[in-house]
């Protein structure tokens, strides 16, 4: 999956794998990491950062982690008013070559309600076109929707991004255990974090305590990795 987004300073993309340019290669003939304007008007090597990424004619100050398999998951933290998930949906609908085929993306909105985006190379469907999302967004596996919806909508205190990530990974091992984290206050992007099982257990226990008493979560197994 690839979404081109911009945090106002840097383009936070690991690499683009859904677009190919045969003329952008290294001395061994292998493709170089690069970014491309959505209308294909400009192409930049990954080492270049002095340009302004545009999504559907506007800046979207956001974070995402981009992976090249369906099992990678992403986070977006929207920072300013006016930049909402609708603009991402419109972008995806008009630039479908940026999307993985037959993928489902889970969105947690500012009210901790989950919504599902479905995309193929033929269409982009969304049931979320209302207010901007200000809370962390997780893109992941579609089968997580029902359970996570119960968890997030019954939380007495909203989960923070790290708790959301670890909870999702604990319930759905297919999401893996590594992730990227961007600190909005410091602007520091830490790549490929792999927490210890002890830290994961501690985070999960803290998150579960936030869940309202009317919801009885199942025990969360943490697989030793």
Task: Label the predicted regions.
Residues 1-103, 127-166, 179, 190-224:
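Conserved short S/T/G-enriched processing/targeting/catalytic segments and their helical context
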Residues 17-20, 114, 121-124:
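Short, surface-exposed beta-strand-loop junctions and turns on beta-sheet-rich folds
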Residues 100-121, 172-188, 192:
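Conserved phosphate-donor
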């Amino acid at each position: 999956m690839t979404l081109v987004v911009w945090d106002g300073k840097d383009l936070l993309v690991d690499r683009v794998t859904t677009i190919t340019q045969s003329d952008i290669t290294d001395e061994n003939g292998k493709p170089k990491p690069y970014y491309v304007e959505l209308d294909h008007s400009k192409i930049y090597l990954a080492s270049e950062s002095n340009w302004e990424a545009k999504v559907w004619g506007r800046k979207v100050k956001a974070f995402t982690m981009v992976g090249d398999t369906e099992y990678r998951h992403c986070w977006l933290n929207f920072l300013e008013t006016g930049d909402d998930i609708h603009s991402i949906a419109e972008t995806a609908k008009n630039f479908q070559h940026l999307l993985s085929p037959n993928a489902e993306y889970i969105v947690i909105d500012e009210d901790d309600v989950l919504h599902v985006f479905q995309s193929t190379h033929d269409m982009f469907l969304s049931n979320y076109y209302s207010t901007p999302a200000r809370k962390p967004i997780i893109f992941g596996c579609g089968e997580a929707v029902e359970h996570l919806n119960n968890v997030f909508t019954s939380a007495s205190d909203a989960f923070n991004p790290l708790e959301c990530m670890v909870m999702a990974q604990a319930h759905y091992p297919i999401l893996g255990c590594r992730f990227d984290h961007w600190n909005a206050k410091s602007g520091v992007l830490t790549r490929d974090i792999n927490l210890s099982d002890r830290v994961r257990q501690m985070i999960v226990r803290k998150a579960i305590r936030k869940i309202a008493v009317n919801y009885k979560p199942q025990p969360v197994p943490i697989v030793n990795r």
